[in-house]
Regions:
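Hydrophobic alpha-helical and helix-loop surface patches within well-folded domains
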Residues: 1-149, 153-155
Length: 156
């Protein structure tokens, strides 16, 4: 599974990049949303109590939602900051164990954006938000009211 096209060999045209993005949405993002909307979903990050549990936690949530969240992060901080942050992370932590926060810190330094604060909500919680937008006009001005709730596939 590819999260992003090979960043050193970008697609040769806007059309190829668009094909890649479309393929990602149909193959990965939709699957992640479907599974993450179920009651038996789980966060991307899960504590492992025993090595025998490791295989159990790598499922479509881990891979598809994980890939979707990384794609969202890439779009949030931009390609240059993403590449710079990943290079810093891989260089600083090569041959070492790390925590998720180490990755967020490298990407935060490269981008100047609050990566840890934003991304922790996506990796430590199951599900995703459903945003409701209400539009009305008052005294000639358009007013938007946004509310959000956790989306559940069963409607509850």
């Amino acid at each position: 599974m590819r999260v992003l096209p090979n960043l050193s060999i970008m697609p040769s045209s806007d059309y190829d990049f668009l094909k890649f993005q479309t393929q990602f949405v149909s193959d990965t993002l939709i699957s992640a949303l479907e599974f993450d909307a179920l009651k038996n979903s789980h966060p991307i990050e899960i504590e492992v109590g025993h090595p025998s549990e490791v295989e159990e936690i790598f499922d479509s949530i881990s891979y598809n939602k994980g890939a979707s969240v990384i794609r969202m992060l890439h779009n949030y901080i931009g390609n240059d900051a993403f590449k710079q942050g990943m290079k810093h992370y891989l260089t600083k932590h090569s041959y070492k164990n790390t925590q998720t926060e180490d990755l967020w810190a490298s990407l935060e330094t490269a981008s100047g954006k609050p990566v840890g604060k934003v991304m922790t909500t996506w990796t430590s919680q199951m599900g995703f938000p459903l945003i409701h937008v209400e539009s009305r006009v008052e005294a000639g001005k358009k007013i938007l009211t946004l509310t959000q709730e956790k989306f559940n596939a069963d409607g509850r």
